[in-house]
Amino acid sequence: MKQSCVAILSACALFTGASAFAPAAPSVVSQTQLQMGFFDNLFGGATSADITETVYFDVTSGGEPLGRIEMGLYGDVVPKTVANFKALCTGEKGYGYKGSVFHRIIPGFMCQGGDFTNFKVMSAGKLSWCIIVISILENYYVAEWHDACAVGTGGKSIYGRTFPDENFDIKHGGAGTLSMANAGPNTNGSQFFICTADTPWLDGKHTVFGKVTKGLDIVRKMESLGSQSGATRTEVKISTSGTV
């Protein structure tokens, strides 16, 4: 099964010219698992740390201003991850988050963004060649269809296309938690997500590097524009970004 999946992925990537291992949305678990405390104390550690840097996003919805989100970053705990995110906020390397979109928003879960390389080529209501992304979640293979050139399949770090997981010292501490999206171990790039609920099952899989310090109400407004599939009802864009 695994060999077949890899073969399909390789063929699709070669055919479309797209990456078959683009960052996918963090996995969702059932409310039953949460209510039973299935993930309680699975990973020890703090849910926050000292803030060393503060950055911001000015967000629009359908071209209209939605508000500003400020995020405090944990530079003492994950300096490499923080340096990457900060540089992409300022655009000091010649590329970054300004003008990119939150391409996947799932109410009661998270808002994901950070693909600033492929977001411009997506055309609403129009399908092109598709690829299959196989995510290995525990012992299950989950197939997702993605537009071959669509938002959510790109991005890059300041260190190259990807960089390793720095550590998992900070746990996902509920709404406002800022964490790296990935396509598996050691595949961090530029994509990230802001949690809108408790997500303890992500501990040990995604690197937490900050939290929302101002504008959680703006995150809630963004959340209301999403859907269970992750598709947004209107374009949610980072119009500007930088340091505070």
Positions of PLM-derived features:
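Cyclophilin-like peptidyl-prolyl cis-trans isomerases
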Residues: 5-8, 15-244
